[in-house]
Amino acid sequence: MLDRSSRPVPGNNASGKHRKSLFASFLSYYAPQKHLFILDTICAIILACIELAFPQILRSLTKGLFTQSKDAILGSLVFIAVGLVVMYFVHFLCRYFVISWGHIMGARMESKMREDLFDAYERMSFSYYDRHKTGDLMSRLVSDLFDISETAHHGPEYLIIGLLEIAGSFVILAFINVPLTLVLAGIAAVLVVFNFFANMHMRGIFKENRMRISDVNTQLEDSLSGIRVVKGFAAEDHERKKFRASNSAYLDSKANMYQAMGRYQAAISGMMGVLNTVVLVLGGWMIAQGQMQAIDLATYALYISLFTTPIMNILNFTETFQKGLAGFKRFTEILETQPDIQDAPGARDIQITAGEIIYQDVHFAYNNAEEVIDGLNLHIESGKTVALVGPSGGGKSTTCALLPRFYDVTSGSITIDGQDIRSVTQHSLRSAIGMVQQDVYLFDGTIAENIAYGCPEASEEDIALAAKRANIAEFIESLPDGYDTQVGQRGTRLSGGQKQRISIARVFLKNPPLLILDEATSALDNESERAVQESLSELAKNRTTLVIAHRLSTIMGADEIITINHGRAVERGTHDELLEKGGIYAHYYQMQFGGAPNIARR
């Protein structure tokens, strides 16, 4: 089907709603951690209260107790010490909880988001992966979610502690000296305004930085996945140049980011220096005028730190917040993207009674491009083996990809036993179809785990029987670790024929009524091809089977051979019938078995 991914494009009025929706979505991840969040909040409040209390305690003692007699002071020191020890022990416990369990809360939220993101990736249709780079998707799963986790933890901590300390210290500062506090508030307002505009500038820089690290991840994933091709073409220098180009672009964006951060931090520090200078000079003038006591200025200086430090923390946190916000936006973009292929409302499980497949006037195009399938009509009878041949790009693989709904038809219909495949659930449809492809993918794990992929409940006996039917059991049993042998990522420790037969064993174990064999032997040597072909012949018995093959020797015995060209069925018949027609199939046969006569393509 054409691209139907739904991404909201908010206008001016929708922008606010989108921000609210984004905020509500973010808050929803706190819900499972609400008890931890409440405790974290309580500890943060206690920390703020203790921080605010100490300068006031010092001021009271200096103005009161410490002006009394020596005996009075010494007699009270034990009680003061005990009180402060208790207070700072509570401070220690709360600080430990906020730092450790606050981060654990963020990590749990990150873990849940990572699961949700992976689930979203698994839901996406093939067309989504046709449009997106793997490195970018990996970056969202790792880098973005780490930044979101930091925001989830430090956001409430800095806001709760910071706002309490700012409000509390401001009230106390005003209580000590109103004019000086108004000056302080004015300078703080300049700090906030400066921070607002600086963040607007840095937001674009952070976004650029994320794009560059995604490019690095994509280049790395591409080079490592294709390392055998790289080595085979001695193209290491070429790959190094490509990687260094993307890495250099990332370095430039990161240098730009750090320069912006440096300018920002330096400007903030300069403003803080101005603030301290103004307070000290103005406070000294007030002391000289008899409008303020020296102890009040000393206490005032302590509270300035309590007033400005949380402001600095909150302003500095905006860097983390910007990264987290950018990451969460990218995160929600994926969660809100609807897969192109979805179950219809009320979709039922497919019921395979015979295995008859009908393509009726099927049209298909990739992403609004030129049609690949153009009015295709096929009738594949139950239990028959039908081979599709034709030129590369003629539509053979696309024809097979439409059957399990990896893509949806643009128009027309495909039915199995009279059931339109769009009216049944994807899970039941794909469970009814077994696929053996040219490019076999084995997962990092044991041979047994790979054979049982899709059937994790299979017993050892079932796995061994499937391997035997696929003509791979003897080889597996000759290995020191047998079925527990590690295959390596993508099956790198096995030959092409061995991997192919393991993939066939998978399908034997799955035991589906429908089968698709897509160039299953084209990459094998003659000996491996014979072994695999025997396995495939056994596999195709009593199943409706679609076969794609360029090696005509593998499909001569098919019940019917259909030539696909330009997305249409242009010839059909048995091997002998098509040779007699002298058409495209006969031309291919002559090229493979009787030389390559100069016959125009039909």
Where in the sequence are the language-model features?
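Transmembrane helices of ABC transporter permease
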Residues: P32, L36-C49, M87, H154-E208, ...
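Membrane-integrated ABC transporters
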Residues: M1-E51, F66-I80, V98-G102, G106, ...
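An intracellular "coupling" helix at the cytosolic face of ABC transporter transmembrane type-1 domains
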Residues: P32-H35, F126-S127, S143-A152, P156, ...
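Juxtamembrane helix-loop junctions of ABC transporter transmembrane domains
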Residues: G11-R19, I42-C43, I50-K63, M87-T134, ...
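Helix-loop junctions and hydrophobic alpha-helical segments within the transmembrane domains
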Residues: L117, Y121, V230, F331, ...
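Helix-loop-helix
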Residues: T67-S69, I73, I172-G186, A260-K329, ...
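Transmembrane helix-loop-helix hairpins at lipid-water interfaces of multipass membrane proteins
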Residues: F37-C94, A174-P179, G290-A294
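ABC-type nucleotide-binding domain
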Residues: I350-R602
